[in-house]
Amino acid sequence: MKKELTRRSFLKLAGAGALAVAMSGSLTGCDVIENLKDMDSVSAAIGDVKFMLSASAWTNGVGGQENDVTYQPTCEIRNNSKKAVTYGGIGSNCEVIITGVLTDKNGKEYPMTYAGENGSAPAGEKYEVKDFKLVAVGKKLYMEGSKVVTTFTYKGKKGCLYRV
């Protein structure tokens, strides 16, 4: 028996697929997620502001019983809004709050704090955050086999960027 895919059936299936992809962001708690592993960069857009991470560097710090892991990607903010947007860590009173979670090779999660300087991305421009840095601290914590989720919270919405 030969099965034919009609134009109408194709459009229904394509619409269902597009809806499934769009809804995957709501399942993870993020509004817009874009993962571009082939291009070695990831980006997320919230309204008129787009956040991009690429070319990451990891460092292990050594301290007594605890180690810190520093994650330093190249971070760019494309601000297509009509006014400058401020960014910083938790407690900075900035419009964009930057946080992260590091998951080690055993699946244990460590909160990451933004350790760069607070700043402002000018309106209508692509802006590189010069000292973007997230730091996690934990016992016997090392970067090998770890992954990071960086979260940008802006106007009550979250954009999550995944790096393995």
Where are the regions a protein language model picked out?
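Low-complexity, acidic Ser/Thr/Pro/Gly-rich terminal tails and inter-domain linkers that flank the onset
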Residues: 36-66
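Short, solvent-exposed, Trp/other aromatic-anchored flexible loops in extracytoplasmic proteins
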Residues: 107-152
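Bacterial Sec-type N-terminal signal peptides, specifically the leucine/valine-rich hydrophobic h-region
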Residues: 24-27
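Short, hydrophobic/aromatic beta-strand segments
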Residues: 83-92
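Short, solvent-exposed loop/turn segments enriched in Ser/Thr/Gly
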Residues: 67-74
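Asparagine-centered strand-capping/turn motif at beta-strand->loop junctions
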Residues: 77-81
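N-terminal secretory signal peptides and thylakoid transit peptides that target proteins
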Residues: 2-18
